[in-house]
Amino acid sequence: MKSISIVFPVYNEKENLEKLISSWDESLRLQNIDHEFVIVEDGSTDGTKKLILELEKKYPIINLSQNHKRGYTTAVIDGIYSSSKKFILCTDSDNQIKVKSLIENLNNFPEINEFLVGFRNPRKDPLNRLIYSKIFKILHDLLFNSKLKDPSCPFVIGLKVTYKKLDKKKLLYMKEGFWWGFIGHCIKKNIKFKEISIEHFRRETGEAGYKLKDLIGIVVRNIIGLIKIKIG
């Protein structure tokens, strides 16, 4: 029997979370998959914390809740290191990626020193995020030559032992663009990738993480972070 921890960083996702956990849990039980949900709650202010306490009573949840905001990168890393199953899937809690993408790849799980990564086909995000990603991918390809279609896709499956080979300090270089840095660091560590097409959906409720006015600062910090990973 396969066993997997699903890491969900969560911030103000009260409207999405119950539907998300319910659908994932039902599908995984039908496939007889041993699973747990590692919910890394990040200082939500919309009632998400209270909802998670209720969901804990019904579902296999590890609740990593904090009163302050640690940020996406630290949330993902905390989730990885709190997971107990053989495999770990890291993905987002905005319900833009469905459990179907995991179920369809149960026979395609990665070996050691390998990650199964998604590319959103097609990607259903706001125009400003699509433009930013296309431009930033040019820099990422110049630095790392990853050959991946979608290096920032938040759908990554790997063995726990493979995740543990990564350097937490270097992953923290990318405070706001975690998956770009994650892929770059893996390339530096000679870890391989299998890339799969996954269906991507528009966000039904809530807002995307970054505002347009913050984008210039994010771009500058991410460029510095990628360069530090490259030369580190």
Question: What is the predicted function of each stretch?
Answer:
Residues 35, 49-82:
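Conserved donor nucleotide-binding strand/loop of the catalytic core
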Residues 10-11, 40-42:
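Conserved sequence signature across two-component system core domains
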Residues 2-4, 25-39, 60-62:
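Short loop->beta transition adjacent to catalytic acidic/histidine clusters or analogous donor-positioning motifs
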Residues 13-17, 44, 72:
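Donor nucleotide-sugar binding loop of glycosyltransferases
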Residues 1-3, 15, 145, 169-232:
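Hydrophobic helical membrane-anchoring modules
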Residues 41-50, 95:
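A conserved acidic beta->alpha catalytic loop
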Residues 67-82, 87-90, 99-176, 203-213, ...:
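Acceptor/aglycone-binding surface of glycosyltransferases and processive sugar-polymer synthases
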Residues 13-28:
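Short, well-formed alpha-helical segments that are part of the catalytic scaffolds
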